[in-house]
Amino acid sequence: MGMISEKDRYLLLSDLCARLPYGLKCEVLCVKETLNADFIKHIINDKTFQIKPYLRPMSSLTYDEVCHLCYLQKLVGEVTRYNVEDFDTEGEVSVVLTYIGADGTPHEVFHYLIAPCKKTSLEVWDWLNENFLDFRGLIARGLALEAPKKMYKEKK
């Protein structure tokens, strides 16, 4: 991994700190570990300290998870199909949904942007962190590893 830019280091540190309470798995100096506060201290004090979290790509969202995300964002209607379209490093997640509205009217495509400015977003960001989803684009930047499918147990 070597030296990373200050911007990437800050992005990684922000992500790791937000996930600290949830049992995030990481590769630390090539060994799989569960994230703890000692690793955070190393990252702050040593710019060459190598740690990569295992995160789920946004494309791994399940139907039930998308439904829950819609519930958290106070969206009405039953989701019948979905596709995670895109996400960027600023924390915005674009989700394209085909759904049946509360009035029973089918809507072919509903494009929804989950963005930090939404008043319900704190719940959403906590949920995304708790479910180890890579909404910051760390995998694409080489700052995180894609988690194997069953690394994190499904929450009931």
Question: What spans do the regions from the language model cover?
Answer:
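Structural boundary micro-motifs
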Residues: M1-K156
